[in-house]
Amino acid sequence: MIDQETDGIEKLETGIPGFDFLSDGGLPLGRATLIAGTAGSAKTIFASQFLVEGIQRGENGVFVTFEEPPKALRKNMRGFGWDIQQWENEGKWVFVDASPQPGDRPIVSGEYDLGALIARIEHAVRKYKASRISLDSLGAIFSHLSDSAQVRSDLFRLASALRELGVTAIMTAERVEEYGEISRYGVEEFVADNVVIVRNVLADEKRRRTIEILKYRGTDHQKGEFPFTIINKKGIVIIPLSAIELEQKSSDIRITSGSEELDRMCGSGFFRDSIILVSGATGTGKTLMVTEFMDGGVANGERCLVFAFEESREQLIRNATGWGVDFKQMEKEGKLKVVCRYPETTNLENHLIMMKDIIQEFKPNRVAVDSLSALERVSTLKSFREFIIGLTSFIKQQEIGGLFTSTTPNLLGGASITDAHISTITDSIILLRYVEMYGEMRRGITVLKMRGSMHDKDIREFSIDHQGMHIGKPFRNVTGILAGTPMYTAQSEVERLSGLFDEKI
């Protein structure tokens, strides 16, 4: 058992990813915690995972079920890789089955024998030397009581019995609404020492799961709602954004962008641990920049990883081949890994966990994401910004160079790089733009931002052929390129304006 003491309160690590950070060390030892949520908010998974993590730490557990029979729970939890039947055989997990049995007549007020239930719980805890217990769900045993005072009295009696046993308990309770009354009867939260709310909110036709520690008697905890997700073979994974600290080291080492001309524009290349955002309209060359970024890394003996959310693997390989880059050979040599997923396959939290896992497993020196816009369209702005913060902070902690692409909504110009304003999070910004001149469509590139370094301020013309990107000379005597309204300015006017600035200086 791993205990921790905070503010005089001993704590038990739950082992649920992210929760022990939010709770400043885990659940208060020997106390009861209420997990409240609407149907489908993951209360039962939380209660089960609490016992699973305990077993993996050598702590036996008791699961008291009031709704689902043990057989159904065993089957439902098998998808997470939890073999409850085996743990039962080993005496590590025991059910106290208080669920309705076929043929049972409905309970009427005053008939439920709480004393008998408490006796069964006490017997199971003592026999199996359990230190953790989960009760799911309280509403099932108190639904026959119409008097809230009686509900409170019975709850207090149950909580007192658990406290006497010295076990750390999880009790789940049903909520009617995501925001409003904490519990169905309005008294459960007053009996429990701690209250945690899990939500599954529908916003903009998308589901978003969050967890909030509402009450933690006698000890500190993180405030507010935090996103979480449910993953096969893992269970609940909480993403505590407040755990992100700006303590990572900053490197002065430069890495190549894959283009000599762009390296010169950036003052000898990117910093090794920087996050670069490449923004431009469709077809301006963003994926080409990703390809050259990967090619430059592999040429220097670096391991490179690409997450593609718009194109299939075959398309990426074909496009790279067309620019003279052999992705297949790089993969054979183990220097490159290409991961292609459609954004719609899952939510952003799942994508983030998946990307973190792959980064930790492959251990790349460079990571590219093409494109953020594909992920932005399947999420809310809040979820998207949290995703970006979570991903960029993780990449920086690993001291990895990252290149993200973003598609601007306008073909010419653009008022904002993204609706989520992620430009403040990135270290460098490169803009790619179409430039319409004399009935011809050209391309322009500029380094808008390069944190900690001098860089070229010009907007330069570039072309694309079978050898990739070629950056040329600056656009001269042309204004309004970034706004999407390029206008030719006579040389005499340029000289006059330059003279005005010289006079002021």
UniProtKB/Swiss-Prot annotation:
PROSITE patterns referenced in this protein's UniProt entry, alphabetically: KAIC (PS51146)
Modified positions (Phosphoserine) in chain numbering: 423
Catalytic activity annotation: L-seryl-[protein] + ATP = O-phospho-L-seryl-[protein] + ADP + H(+); L-threonyl-[protein] + ATP = O-phospho-L-threonyl-[protein] + ADP + H(+); ATP + H2O = ADP + phosphate + H(+)
Location of the KaiC domain: 10-252, 253-485
Keyword RNA-binding: no
E.C. code: 2.7.11.1, 3.6.4.-
Modified residues (Phosphothreonine): 424
Activity: how regulated: ATPase activity is influenced by KaiB1 and KaiB3 in vitro; ATPase is reduced 35% by the KaiB1 tetramer and 55% by the KaiB3 monomer but not affected by KaiA or the KaiB3 tetramer.
One GO molecular-function entry: protein serine/threonine kinase activity
Temperature dependence: ATPase activity is not temperature compensated, unlike the circadian oscillator, its activity increases with increasing temperature.
Knockout-associated phenotype: No visible phenotype under photoautotrophic conditions in continuous light or in a light/dark regime with or without 0.2% glucose. Growth in the dark (with glucose) is more impaired than in wild type.
GO biological process: regulation of circadian rhythm; regulation of DNA-templated transcription
Pfam families, per the entry: ATPase (PF06745)
Classification via InterPro entries: Circadian_clock_KaiC-rel, Circadian_KaiC_bact, KaiC, KaiC-like_dom, KaiC_C, KaiC_dom, KaiC_N, P-loop_NTPase
Iron-sulfur is among the record's keywords: no
Assembly information from the UniProt record: Multimerizes, probably forming homohexamers, no interaction with KaiC1 or KaiC2 is seen. In another study forms hexamers, interacts with KaiB1, KaiB3, and KaiC1.
Function: Seems to be linked to dark adaption of Synechocystis cells, but is not as essential as the core oscillator KaiAB1C1 for the circadian cycle. KaiB3 and KaiC3 may cross talk with the core oscillator. Autophosphorylates and dephosphorylates independently of KaiA. Has a weak ATPase, hydrolyzes 8.5 ATP/monomer/day, has no detectable ATP synthesis activity. ATPase activity reduced 55% by KaiB3 monomer but not the KaiB3 tetramer or KaiA in vitro, reduced 35% by KaiB1 tetramer.
Annotated family: Belongs to the KaiC family.
UniProt cross-references to NCBIfam families, sorted A to Z: circ_KaiC, PRK09302.1
Domain notes per entry: In the homohexamer the 2 domains (called CI and CII) self-associate to each form a 'donut' layer; the compactness and local conformation of the domains varies over the cell cycle and impacts function. CII has the autokinase and autophosphatase activities, both CI and CII have (weak) ATPase activity.
Name of the featured protein: Circadian clock protein KaiC3
The species this protein was found in: Synechocystis sp. (strain ATCC 27184 / PCC 6803 / Kazusa)
Recorded name of the encoding gene: kaiC3
